[in-house]
């Protein structure tokens, strides 16, 4: 039994430092690197790619809405073509840094509001999936498990890694609880570790409303910018390995 453990990194920019990238890279099996729109800048992207390649983790682009002030977590209403183009732009930027460093881009995972909106909006899901396919149909798309983005991407012939979150609470419909709700962000390392093992071994976790929801995950996400992120990540990886679950990127590019 195995599971991919991914984390969002490279979100610092200019004088602003966000997250604990070095610690997260050492724990994860795949990483999602910001591409300059919600976070990141050229220097941060270059350094983060180099660190990821040295660690041997799978590297993915982490495109978001053009919203540095809101960290890409505010909804934006854009035409589908605009969404497709802004994702192509960001994938291209990160892909260039990866190739310049001698690596190969493995996957794409949308960020923040873009991720959440594409999980429930068919038109937006199609815009996201189309962007990935146009850049490189061999790229793996990381998407919320059970969401419309998963089905849309599969219809376009993309390989999809269905994602679950060990540091976020769920609503009964399988979507993530908004961050402004009490308890929406899991900050206790032991709780996060227990949830991770349950997700992999049983495929079920309780929602915030107490309902048991089904989650078939190929990859588990940890946020590098959450409070105590490094401690949570260490606890999750240790819990998985203690339970006999190997941590490894789940899909290989051909």
Curated annotation (Swiss-Prot):
It is an enzyme of class 3 (hydrolase). It catalyses: 5-oxo-L-proline + ATP + 2 H2O = L-glutamate + ADP + phosphate + H(+). One of its GO terms (biological process) is carbohydrate metabolic process. GO terms for molecular function: 5-oxoprolinase (ATP-hydrolyzing) activity; ATP binding. It comes from the Bacteria. Keywords: ATP-binding, Hydrolase, Nucleotide-binding. Its EC number is 3.5.2.9. HAMAP family: PxpA. Catalyzes the cleavage of 5-oxoproline to form L-glutamate coupled to the hydrolysis of ATP to ADP and inorganic phosphate. Forms a complex composed of PxpA, PxpB and PxpC. Belongs to the LamB/PxpA family. NCBIfam families: PRK05406.1-3, PRK05406.1-5. This is 5-oxoprolinase subunit A. It comes from Heliobacterium modesticaldum (strain ATCC 51547 / Ice1).
């Amino acid at each position: 039994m195995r599971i991919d453990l991914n984390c969002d990194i490279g979100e610092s920019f200019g004088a602003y430092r966000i997250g604990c990238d070095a610690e997260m890279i050492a724990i994860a099996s795949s990483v999602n690197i910001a591409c300059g729109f919600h976070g990141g800048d050229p220097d941060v992207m270059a350094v983060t790619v180099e660190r990821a390649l040295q660690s041997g983790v799978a590297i993915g682009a982490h495109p978001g809405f053009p919203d540095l002030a809101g960290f890409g977590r505010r909804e934006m209403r854009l035409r589908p073509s605009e969404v497709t183009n802004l994702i192509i732009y960001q994938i291209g930027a990160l892909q260039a840094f990866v190739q310049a460093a001698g690596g190969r881009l493995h996957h794409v995972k949308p960020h923040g509001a873009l991720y959440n909106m594409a999980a429930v909006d068919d038109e937006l899901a199609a815009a996201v999936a189309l962007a990935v396919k146009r850049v490189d149909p061999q790229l793996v798309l990381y998407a919320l498990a059970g969401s419309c983005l998963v089905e849309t991407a599969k219809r376009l012939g993309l390989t999809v890694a269905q994602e679950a979150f060990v540091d976020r609470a769920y609503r009964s419909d399988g979507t993530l609880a908004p961050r402004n709700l009490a308890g929406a962000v899991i900050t206790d390392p032991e709780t996060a570790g227990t949830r991770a093992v349950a997700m992999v071994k049983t495929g079920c976790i309780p929602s915030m409303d107490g309902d048991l929801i089904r989650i078939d995950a190929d990859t588990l996400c940890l946020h590098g910018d959450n409070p105590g992120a490094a401690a949570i990540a260490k606890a999750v990886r240790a819990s998985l390995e203690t339970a006999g679950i190997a941590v490894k990127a789940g899909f290989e590019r051909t």
